[in-house]
UniProtKB/Swiss-Prot annotation:
Pfam families: EF-G_D2 (PF22042), GTP_EFTU (PF00009), IF-2 (PF11987), IF2_N (PF04760). One of the essential components for the initiation of protein synthesis. Protects formylmethionyl-tRNA from spontaneous hydrolysis and promotes its binding to the 30S ribosomal subunits. Also involved in the hydrolysis of GTP during the formation of the 70S ribosomal complex. Belongs to the TRAFAC class translation factor GTPase superfamily. Classic translation factor GTPase family. IF-2 subfamily. Residues 339-348 have a biased composition (Basic residues). It comes from Streptococcus pyogenes serotype M4 (strain MGAS10750). Residues 463-470 are annotated as: G1. Residues 599-601 are annotated as: G5. This is Translation initiation factor IF-2. Residues 322-338 have a biased composition (Low complexity). GO terms for cellular component: cytosol. The gene is infB. Residues 509-512 are annotated as: G3.
Amino acid sequence: MSKKRLHEIAKEIGKSSKEVVEHAKYLGLDVKSHASSVEEADAKKIISSFSKASKPDVTASQTVKPKEVAQPSVTVVKETGSEHVEKTQVSKPKSRNFKAEREARAKEQAARKQANGSSHRSQERRGGYRQPNNHQTNEQGDKRITHRSQGDTNDKRIDRKASNVSPRHDNHQLVGDRNRSFAKENHKNGRFTNQKKQGRQEPQSKSPKIDFKARAAALKAEQNAEYSRQSETRFRAQQEAKRLAELARQEAKEAALKAQAEEMSHREAALKSIEEAETKLKSSNISAKSTADNRRKKQARPEKNRELTHHSQEGQKKNKKSWNSQNQVRNQKNSNWNKNKKTKKGKNVKNTNTAPKPVTERKFHELPKEFEYTEGMTVAEIAKRIKREPAEIVKKLFMMGVMATQNQSLDGDTIELLMVDYGIEAKAKVEVDDADIERFFEDENYLNPENIVERAPVVTIMGHVDHGKTTLLDTLRNSRVATGEAGGITQHIGAYQIEEAGKKITFLDTPGHAAFTSMRARGASVTDITILIVAADDGVMPQTIEAINHSKAAGVPIIVAINKIDKPGANPERVIAELAEYGIISTAWGGECEFVEISAKFNKNIDELLETVLLVAEVEELKADPTVRAIGTVIEARLDKGKGAIATLLVQQGTLHVQDPIVVGNTFGRVRAMVNDLGRRVKSAEPSTPVSITGLNETPMAGDHFAVYADEKAARAAGEERSKRALLKQRQNTQRVSLDNLFDTLKAGEIKTVNVIIKADVQGSVEALAASLVKIEVEGVRVNVVHSAVGAINESDVTLAEASNAVIIGFNVRPTPQARQQADTDDVEIRLHSIIYKVIEEVEEAMKGKLDPVYQEKVLGEAIIRETFKVSKVGTIGGFMVINGKVTRDSSVRVIRDSVVIFDGKLASLKHYKDDVKEVGNAQEGGLMIENFNDLKVDDTIEAYIMEEIVRK
């Protein structure tokens, strides 16, 4: 037999090759493309099937027509069918059940094998064209119907469809005429092909097909409309309740005012009416709330009867829940019919039939009346403070011409403009600098007036060198400490407290030498009363005038003590006249200053002086609050070898306790221990009490203020901040070379400099010595202080001196053995002194180049005190052992304790056992006594030395 290609068949019948290929596949032919060949019989079958599909179905309809029950029913069915045809042509199905298609395809292949190719899958035709494979209608179950070869079986199925009793076809009935004619023709030809006609199978029911998606959308829209109606009703009910409540409240107020104006007896009736109004308000609120809740509950409950019945169903299918239908979409994930089924575990199936969630009403927040802002606030921070969305603020800023994001910082002007736009009064927040402890001394608003009590006066003793300041203080304390001062002058501030007539007085002893100007100014700044001591035989001296100026600058009252009236040349009247020239006028002359003539050496009129001090203090009304955190001033500071930094503090306000976190100057720490002026440990210090504390991380400067903080964290932060600011200020003071000072800079390079390193026992001495050396004026030569610090001379000082070619000046300190050995090796000169004007004179003469032959100190040896013996009417004898060199009878000795010189003097006696000897050699033991010194202690170092005259070349 000859074969034909599919594209030739398509050309012959006037169809596209694609349609012919698909049609051949549906007829069960094994073809792949338009180039595939088929037998002549199969080609005729394809052509005949196309010609049959194009014939009108009027005859078939007329043939089936007598079997219909009633003519009106057929007319309705035909109309309904035509509607479905038009709808199916427009709309496309949303999903395919691939599993069902695979099963149906497998059944088709099995049926073809049994029927030997005589049974083929029916094809839905519309207008002569085959529907696409994935174009499934809602009647997907009727798509694949396989007929058996027996004619009676096919007739039974057709009859069952026509009688509308099949359980598999609940929603449809066949348009019997056309289907039966095709079924008979297929039975005669031996092929059981159930082809769908151009008019398509019409549903059995009289109503159109149910569009579940449209129904779900309509249901959701209906629910939303119902909810909005209920929200509006609820809102109107609430507004009405508020209006009624407001009217009731106004009526109650008017009734109350009227009753009060008419007669006081009607007050009870007014109160009763107010109570009734409040009850009415509560009942209206409750009723409105209950109505809203009930309506909300009704709206949220779904209507169960919506899916129970089909509005056009008849017979047994009516009132049947969830009936099975082959026209129903098999993939029912988005179907309302699936709402009562349990969701499989692990499947996130969204239920589309749930009632819509109510929209949460946004709360309205009122804007604040005032807004306190800080520089650099972000948009998000401002939005949070005024309870607005950041996007709203960004929009307002954009309208103002400012482009900003919610994390961008704004300046003060922009924030104020923004607040003006909102109608809010903007105020800049005043930030308190926690690192500024000076504010406590300027502003006393933090004090509690109820806790203020009287405090002890702080008295500073001022005067010229050797006018008797320390002797007076020694007499007041009943001790002989004045003899211990080198050269008869005080080298640093001493703070002491005495008690007179049941009241305490705090004394500050300041040095009188010109080098200690800053220390005298410091003493005047913390004092309440100044005692100006003037020698009756010397009169007014330069340091006396300076003390007067310091006291006047501090604004403190002055009490003049004319000392040494026991001397033969004493002339108190001359002193009074000289002081009057500087504004210090006695009360006897009509002035304001008290004058007291005393003799500190013989304890004359000392009681009168103390009474005068207490009288002036009472007039000044000195007060303090002991309940606040302590503040005060550093009197002196030094570095101890074993204890570290030690600071002498004067408490001015509050009470200082042990373990208090404290900031002192540019350093910080915690009060580890407190010692009073008598050397006893104390746990607290009240106002006007001097104490020495330990526990600071660095040595502060004398004159620095201190303040106690709430916790150690705050103290550490404040101390570090103050240290950072001080370093920044020091860097800013560095001089830069410019065209104006270029000549001066070049000229300064030609000047010779003398580099010095200063080490002293206390901070005040370091400051005084450095300031004095810098002030020395010698043409062509100047002093450069390379380094100054508190403590003994150590190896690092020697290394620095070698690098900078400097001279080390030790004031009341000694070098360590390692430092001395390194200085000898590196040829570094160390000058040790105990009197400040000796240092100044030596440096000045060296600068002028007029140094005469000088005496050089030569150390003979060192000894350690092993034991002390106190002998009455003789003094203290020290048993010693020589550890280096020798100790001679005519040598001078220094008593060194913790690398600090305690005393410098001559030997009174030197013995080896009971014999007087001229010297005691190395590793030998002996005993010694020192002139005018009895405070020897075990482990003190005795350094023996002599002064050798050398000629300077």
